[in-house]
Amino acid sequence: MEQEARVLRAAGGFGRARRLLASASWVPCIVLGLVLSSEELLTAQPAPHCRPDPTLLPPALRALRGPALLDAAIPRLGPTRAPAEALGVLSPSYLAPLTRAPRPSSWASCSGAAAGPTWNLVCGDGWKVPLEQVSHLLGWLLGCVILGAGCDRFGRRAVFVASLVLTTGLGASEALAASFPTLLVLRLLHGGTLAGALLALYLARLELCDPPHRLAFSMGAGLFSVVGTLLLPGLAALVQDWRLLQGLGALMSGLLLLFWGFPALFPESPCWLLATGQVARARKILWRFAEASGVGPGDSSLEENSLATELTMLSARSPQPRYHSPLGLLRTRVTWRNGLILGFSSLVGGGIRASFRRSLAPQVPTFYLPYFLEAGLEAAALVFLLLTADCCGRRPVLLLGTMVTGLASLLLLAGAQYLPGWTVLFLSVLGLLASRAVSALSSLFAAEVFPTVIRGAGLGLVLGAGFLGQAAGPLDTLHGRQGFFLQQVVFASLAVLALLCVLLLPESRSRGLPQSLQDADRLRRSPLLRGRPRQDHLPLLPPSNSYWAGHTPEQH
């Protein structure tokens, strides 16, 4: 690890070229955040309404139209035969002459102007919405795991470019889907390719930065992703059709490929090239970094050798590329445990949000207010991490976020029926904020403790665990929300367990990225609270007079 670090310092360190490339990597996050957030808008359920169904009325009343049909269809309740409310959800015993209107959701056009068929996603077909959500999240999970391992074998740039090509094609295909099963498969594949692009971009950015700037550039990328989330409703209001919105997302992915497909804007990670022994490819990139930073490849100082000398030494040590299987993680002593703990905390942070959203729903029943609230909470969580994770350390902040998440969940679980509305709202918002912080910090923490040779696979497993947790909400909806209370109990208990596991993690703040499996195993757990420096022990007995007679105070 020391030799690779010397090579990067000889190439100018975190100089002008690397700063510009790391900053330019923020721009694709806007598009990726917009496309990722489109899932919530595409699957938004319309408000329930009822309409008369003439086929359920007696034959003599089927010819009625307008107010007369509505008056005949509305059930009469009680001894006074008062008409029931026509809007809203009616109880099954009074639903005989009425059916819920298939009001258009995000996948159906009210005017029928959309190209191709539309699908009814309410009433008896409401199961299609959570099924699509589960399919899309499953695609993200598989993409993180499979393409994360691909990043370690083929490189960050190769996976990023290939994922953007597939994302553009699949996004355009979704806009032309002719059946719901086709759309389901396309959404699964689309989620996987988006995960690959996001993961490769995250790894390349992190490996460009030096330890003091890793947190700032990672959180900055998250804030740009929030910008894409905030832009999505405006674009949806502009195009007024979900197919056009999907086509617009594919167009923006194509523009990303047009610009970031060039090596000048997205070069291969020199950190990965050096760790896998591809010194010849790393030499070209590092020389370009050195020239852009004003450092000559042959320049050297008294403390360090020149870039050319360091690269020559690396070439002699590793003449052939060396790739590592993700299964090598099982042969480590400490790294597998760190990955397991961070994956567990990511699972809890992603899965527990459903309970907070459920508690938040009665307080803010509209769609746009919770949407913008969650986007604002994600931005607030990133700013909180930016301010605290460097000065306090990764592990204490993750411990605090996990503790707040578990405490808010337990309070809502125990007293939601007895607490006032403003308290439930406050706990829900606090829990969402803390869970967002836990998810973001778990990803950064995992990227810092996994070695470069398997960092893609390790981070992919941690991110995939978070998407697996998020799939718990749609799965419960698919079963009619019958197990929501049990799900809330399970995730609240897991949050308490994660609180204990976080104590076993090492501290990665201000440390260089480990390159090999041996480097990652050297990251050991440090004390959580730093005490005062230990003082010199004073002698139990005062020195004798003969001691003072033979020594002056200065000599003592």
Curated annotation (Swiss-Prot):
GO terms for biological process: monoatomic ion transport. Residues 524-556 are annotated as: Disordered. Residues 1-23, 150-157, 204-218, 268-339, 388-395, 442-448, 505-556 are cytoplasmic. GO terms for molecular function: transmembrane transporter activity. Belongs to the major facilitator (TC 2.A.1) superfamily. Organic cation transporter (TC 2.A.1.19) family. PANTHER family: SOLUTE CARRIER FAMILY 22 MEMBER (PTHR24064). This is Putative solute carrier family 22 member 31. It comes from Homo sapiens (Human). The gene is SLC22A31.
